[in-house]
């Protein structure tokens, strides 16, 4: 039996809104949170859903039906959906402050017979032929690094002599805050979780932001939107007494509604610096949504090949760094906003959730929670 590896890589940057696509990634995040309630988490819902979408293109039979249902794409022609998906984020880097970079690579072993129709339709998006038994790790890493700038994305534990197909997508986001935090005002202060209190570097800025208190089943949460400079991308921060309940309530339509309820306010915002890196085997999560593609007897990818491929591994590596300048930030001139009214105090000194969202498409590039900065 022939096997397939899907590897989703993410590093913490349209008018047709693919909410089902976004929701599939959100559901995957919720499954990751279950059993990891006390851990810092960073995950790319977009990276996860994009890998599932790229598995859908060659899928047929029940495998295709399950993937369509997972992303609620049953009434959508995949050709236009794919074009909109790629064009939604894969834009030229037009700003020195904030950009996203999306790449996709499909590596197929030379022994697999690809249908000419499939090759003609999708080869321009990054379809490569190679011998997986001859230095495949170095060859794949070299191609991915050349296209995305990310190094060593695969290792020998992810590929083996059974691997005949590897799908790798990368999304890199680099953002500078619209109103950066003043590094001279960062001070050590307390952060408290259920295990106690620790001292962390707490950033501070006084400026006008969009924020509000939202209510979910009688639970109140403070939410604020931090915009990135020269971009349609924002980080949404939420804090409250029951953050698991907040996360359980998140869906694409809910985020649309909550963001529409945020109004302009003057905040004295305090946010800890944080850096999170997670490497996860997410096969079991994807298997709950689309089980047949992981089953060697039931998987079908006949739109691409008649060879009996099935998926046997799925990973995601994700990383995020947040500091005074922004997210994965480079040095920049600090802008300080002057305000007249008394600012509303909002300090993220207990566990909180963050969501980095492309505001036009609704795509969630990254989301996670900070239990201990």
Curated annotation (Swiss-Prot):
Membrane topology: Peripheral membrane protein
InterPro entries on file: Serpin_dom, Serpin_fam, Serpin_sf, Serpin_sf_1, Serpin_sf_2
Cleavable signal peptide: 1-15
Compartments where found: Virion membrane; Host cell membrane
Pfam families: Serpin (PF00079)
Domain of life per record: Viruses
Coiled-coil regions, chain positions: none
Primary localization: virion
UniProt induction comment: Expressed in the intermediate phase of the viral replicative cycle.
Keyword Signal: yes
Presence of keyword Coiled coil: no
Keywords (A to Z) from UniProt: Host cell membrane, Host membrane, Membrane, Protease inhibitor, Serine protease inhibitor, Signal, Virion
One cellular component (GO) term of this entry: host cell plasma membrane
A single GO molecular function term of this UniProt record: serine-type endopeptidase inhibitor activity
Subunit composition and interactions: Interacts with A56 protein.
Family: Belongs to the serpin family. Orthopoxvirus OPG040 subfamily.
Function: Prevents cell to cell fusion via its interaction with A56 protein. The A56-K2 complex associates with components of the entry fusion complex (EFC) presumably to avoid superinfection and syncytium formation.
Protein known as: Superinfection exclusion protein
Organism this protein belongs to: Variola virus (isolate Human/India/Ind3/1967)
GN (gene name): OPG040
